[in-house]
Design a protein with these regions (language model features):
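Membrane-proximal intracellular helices of multi-pass ion channels
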Residues: 1-479
Length: 479
C-alpha cells in the first residue's frame, strides 16, 4: 500500500474543499448572514490539516487499483465529515449524525433529507447543500485528476474507482484530458440550464441551486414543496435537463466531435430513452383521471419519471398518492437508474443490459450446450471481466440491500417505508414512498438507522467495492 500518495491526495481534497466553501461564504456575505462565519472556520480547518499533508511530495508515485479504491473511499468520507461541520457549528443541523446524513446525502447526490422545514435555513446553508450535489455529481477526484503528480497511466486507476458504471472509457489519450472534457461538458450544461431558468423568471439564487441539484442529479430543493411552486415552463426545463444529465457523457463528446454515428449507436442510451418513453406513456394514462388534462398528466409523468430514473429526486406533486401501478413503475425505475458515465445513480442501464444478456446467453447454452455465444454491446464483445464484475456487483448489491432493510426494521416502521428508504438511499434517489415520500423526510429514523442509510448512500455512489475494501484486512498490508 502506497500510503504517501493516499495521504497526499486526501490533503489535496481538503484544500479543494476549502476552495469550494468559498461559494457559500460569499453567499453569506451577499445576504449578510452571520452563519457564514462557520464556513470561514471550516476553511481554516481544511487548510490547517490539508497544507501539511501536501507539503511533502510523494516519494513513490506508483498508484494501483487497491490504492485507487482506498483513496476514493477515504476521500469521500473525509469530504463528508468536514462538509458537515458548518451545519453543526451554525446550529442549522445541531445533531452531528443528522448533519453527516444531510452532507453525505448532498455529496452522493442522493437528496434524502432529515429537514422538515428547508426554507428556515440561511441562504449560505442552502447554497452549500445544493453545491455539494454539483461537487459530487461528476466526482471531486475526477476534478483534481489534472493536478495529481501521477505518471505511467496511474490516473486511470483513480478514475475507475470513482466513476459510475461497469467500465470507464478514455475520451482522449490522456486521462487528465478526459477529466477536463467531462468537467467542461458538465459546467457548460449547468450554465445553460441556469440561463434558461432565469429566462423563465426564476430568481438567480433559485436558478443556481436548482441547476446544481439537477446537474448532479441530487434533488435538494430550496423550497419545502420541492419544485411544485414553480411554473410549468420551469418544470419542463428541469425535466429536460434531469434526463440529459442522466445520459452517458461519452455521447455528448461524440456529438461535439461530430461522431454522430457513434453517439446514436450507444445501446445503453437508446434503451435509456426507450425506458423513459414507455414509463411516461403508461403513467400518463394511469394518472389522467387525477389531473383531467392529458397535457398536464403527461408533464407530471415526464417530470417524475425523469426525476426518479436519473435519481435526481425533485418532485412537483405527491406521487405517493398516485395509483399503485404508477408507484410501482417509479420504484422499479429507482433500481434501473441512469446511464453509466452520467451523474445519475442506481444499478445503471448498462448493468441491467449486461445482466439480461447474461441470462439470455445462459438460456441459449442450456438449449445448445456446445454453442459459443459472446455477450455484445454496441456491436462489440464485452470482456469476460466486465461481465463477471457486473454479476458480482449485483449479488453484493442484493446482500447489502437486504441487510439494510433488516437493520432499519428495528425502528418498527412499515415495510414500504423501510424498503423504499433503502432503495432511495442506496440508489441515490432521495424520496421513497409512505413516510419517506416526497412530502416526508428521514428525520424520524433512529441514529443507528441513519448511519446505516448513510453507509448505503456512500456505497451506492462509490459503486460498493471502494467502500467495502476498507473492511478487508489485506487492504492495509504494506506490500
Amino acid at each position: 500500500m502506497n500510503y504517501s500518495i493516499i495521504i497526499y491526495i486526501i490533503g489535496m481534497i481538503l484544500e479543494i474543499e476549502a476552495v469550494f466553501m468559498a461559494l457559500p461564504a460569499i453567499t453569506a456575505l451577499i445576504y449578510q448572514e452571520t452563519s457564514g462565519v462557520t464556513f470561514l472556520i471550516t476553511i481554516a480547518l481544511c487548510l490547517v490539516i490539508g497544507l501539511p499533508l501536501t507539503r511533502k511530495k510523494p516519494t513513490r508515485k506508483a498508484f494501483y487499483t487497491k490504492e485507487g479504491f482506498v483513496t476514493v473511499a477515504l476521500s469521500w468520507i473525509v469530504l463528508s465529515i468536514i462538509g458537515a461541520i458548518p451545519f453543526v457549528i451554525s446550529r442549522s443541523i445541531p445533531n452531528p449524525v443528522d448533519a453527516l446524513f444531510e452532507t453525505v446525502s448532498g455529496f452522493t447526490t442522493t437528496g434524502a433529507s432529515i429537514l422538515s422545514d428547508v426554507e428556515a435555513l440561511p441562504h449560505c446553508m442552502l447554497m452549500w447543500r445544493s453545491f455539494t450535489h454539483w461537487i459530487g455529481g461528476m466526482g471531486v477526484l475526477v476534478f483534481i485528476l489534472s493536478l495529481l503528480p501521477l505518471t505511467g497511466g496511474y490516473h486511470m486507476n483513480l478514475m475507475k474507482a470513482e466513476s459510475p458504471g461497469p467500465s470507464v472509457s478514455k475520451l482522449a489519450p490522456k486521462v487528465q484530458s478526459t477529466a477536463k472534457i467531462l468537467y467542461s461538458i458538465y459546467f457548460v450544461m449547468t450554465v445553460i440550464q441556469i440561463l434558461l431558468l432565469l429566462v423563465g423568471g426564476m430568481p438567480l439564487f433559485d436558478s443556481i441551486c436548482t441547476a446544481f441539484g439537477t446537474a448532479g442529479t441530487g434533488g435538494f430543493g430550496i423550497k419545502n414543496d420541492s419544485m411544485a411552486s414553480y411554473s410549468t415552463y420551469l418544470q419542463v426545463v428541469i425535466t429536460v435537463f434531469m434526463i440529459l444529465f442522466g445520459v452517458n457523457f461519452n455521447a455528448y463528446f461524440f456529438i461535439i466531435t461530430k461522431k454522430f454515428a457513434q453517439a446514436f449507436k450507444m445501446e445503453e442510451v437508446r434503451y435509456y430513452f426507450g425506458i423513459i418513453g414507455i414509463a411516461i406513456l403508461i403513467i400518463t394514462c394511469n394518472i389522467y383521471h387525477i389531473f383531467g388534462n392529458a397535457a398536464k398528466a403527461f408533464q407530471q409523468a415526464a417530470f417524475q419519471v425523469g426525476s426518479i430514473i436519473t435519481t435526481t429526486g425533485y418532485a412537483t406533486t405527491d406521487f405517493n398518492t398516485w395509483p399503485e401501478i404508477s408507484r410501482t413503475i417509479l420504484v422499479l425505475l429507482m433500481f434501473i437508474g441512469a446511464c453509466a458515465g452520467s451523474t445519475g445513480g442506481g444499478i445503471k442501464v448498462s448493468r441491467i443490459l449486461i445482466l439480461c444478456k447474461t441470462v439470455r446467453k445462459e438460456l441459449h447454452i442450456f438449449l445448445h450446450p456446445n454453442a459459443i455465444k459472446k455477450i455484445k454491446m454496441d456491436g462489440k464483445a464485452i470482456p469476460h471481466e466486465v461481465v463477471r464484475s457486473t454479476n458480482i456487483f449485483f449479488i453484493v448489491y442484493v446482500l447489502i440491500f437486504a441487510s439494510s432493510i433488516l437493520l432499519i426494521a428495528f425502528d418498527d416502521f412499515d415495510l414500504t417505508t423501510n424498503f423504499t428508504a433503502v432503495a432511495a438511499t442506496f440508489n441515490n434517489i432521495g424520496p421513497g414512498l409512505e413516510l419517506v415520500g416526497p412530502t416526508g423526510n428521514f428525520g424520524m429514523f433512529s441514529w443507528f438507522s441513519k448511519l446505516i442509510l448513510t453507509f448505503d448512500m456512500l456505497a451506492g455512489r462509490l459503486e460498493i467495492f471502494p467502500l467495502l475494501i476498507l473492511f478487508v484486512r489485506d487492504t492495509w498490508k504494506k506490500f
